[in-house]
Amino acid sequence: MEGAAKPDWPLDFARLGRLNGREVALVANGPGPKLAGEAVDVVRKNVSIEAIVSTGFCGGLKLSLGNSEIFVATEVVGSGPALIPTSSRPFKTGKLLSIDRVVSTAVEKYPLGKTADAVEMEASAVAERAHKWNVPFFAVRVVSDRCDQSFPMDFNQMRSPDGRFSRGKIMAAARRRPLSMVPELLKLNKRTKRAAQALGDFLADSQF
């Protein structure tokens, strides 16, 4: 992003700049629909919105989705349709399920795969606002964990009262089982870094 500036907004992260010739606001505020909805509300109060892109990680619910693959939603289940950006890079499409909890295990993912192709935690709140405001909506995600992969811990237990992930809780859990937990967390960190790079490359190449 060119000419990035940091606005004084009450969010975890916010930058204003230009991407592919368009003015953009990049914001992040933590996991879940409440925090994501608050982020979009703050943006709307401060700038004019021409389109909204919900982006980040997702969990695959079908074997056809591999780690670091780009997933573009055609629909957020229960919250309406989503548009598809133009990109020269490969991506897969399908239905996106948005729920307010981390789907931690492959066992939990299996039944969800009957109604959607991927799962995440924020898109529903963003989609509902976009449709209410008649603003074009996109949901672009990158797969951080396949349908047959489980996380090394239940990250739902690692959230603070406001819904954000607590680094202190994660570190405490890792210290209780260092021999098994730490190597798995390092693998997860490596996997998510690779996925984040793939997502960034795709977004930089896309037209919304």
Regions found by a protein language model. Give the residues of each.
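Short, conserved "active-site rim" segments that organize catalytic pockets and cofactor/ligand binding
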Residues: M1-A5, I70
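Glycine-rich phosphate- or other oxyanion-binding loops that anchor nucleotides, phosphorylated ligands
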Residues: W9-F208
